[in-house]
Amino acid sequence: MIQKSFVMMKPDAVQRRLMGKILSRFEEKGLQIVAVKLMQIDEDLAKTHYGEHADKPFFGSLIEYITSSPSLAMVIEGEEAISTIRKLVGATNPLEADLGTIRGDFAMDTGRNIIHASDSPDSAEREINLFFNEDEICDYEIVDNKLIYE
C-alpha cells in the first residue's frame, strides 16, 4: 500500500550538514520525496507537534532543542512508507539503533537523535497536516518506479 509519512531532520542533522546524506538514504531505498522545506520551528508548533510528551521531564529541553536551529520537514511517499522509513531511521535511542540505520550511523544520544519519523498512519496524517498545506505536496510519478515496484 502506498503511504505518505512525515519525516523531519532535526537541528543536529542540519547543523552537522547531514541533510544530503540522510535524504539520499530514502531516495536510494526507492521512496519518493513529495514535499520538503527547511524551516525554523517556533515554540507553538513545537509544542503542538510534541504535545504527547508534554508531561515528560524532557519536554522543556526538547522544545528548546527543536526550536534552536532550522529543521528539514519532509513528506515521503512509497510502498509501506511508514514502516520502511522507521526501519531506515532505527531505534529512538541511537545506542540501540543498528549500524546501517540513520540513527545508528549518525547519532549518539537520544536527546540528539537526528531525525523524527511518523510512527503510524494517524501520526503521519496529523504531522503532515501540521507542517504542510495540501498545495505544498507534489503528486508526480518517478520514471523508475516500474523498476522498483512490481
UniProtKB/Swiss-Prot annotation:
GO BP annotation list: CTP biosynthetic process; GTP biosynthetic process; UTP biosynthetic process
Keyword ATP-binding: yes
One cellular-component annotation, GO: cytoplasm
Cofactor names: Mg(2+)
Keyword tags: ATP-binding, Cytoplasm, Kinase, Magnesium, Metal-binding, Nucleotide metabolism, Nucleotide-binding, Phosphoprotein, Transferase
EC number: 2.7.4.6
GO molecular function ontology, one term from the record: nucleoside diphosphate kinase activity
Residue positions of the active site: H116
Reactions the enzyme catalyzes: a 2'-deoxyribonucleoside 5'-diphosphate + ATP = a 2'-deoxyribonucleoside 5'-triphosphate + ADP; a ribonucleoside 5'-diphosphate + ATP = a ribonucleoside 5'-triphosphate + ADP
Enzyme class: transferase
Predominant subcellular localization, coarse grouping: cytoplasm
Binding residues for ATP: K10, F58, R86, T92, R103, N113
Compartments in which it is found: Cytoplasm
UniProt record similarity statement: Belongs to the NDK family.
Function according to Swiss-Prot or TrEMBL: Major role in the synthesis of nucleoside triphosphates other than ATP. The ATP gamma phosphate is transferred to the NDP beta phosphate via a ping-pong mechanism, using a phosphorylated active-site intermediate.
Protein name in the entry: Nucleoside diphosphate kinase
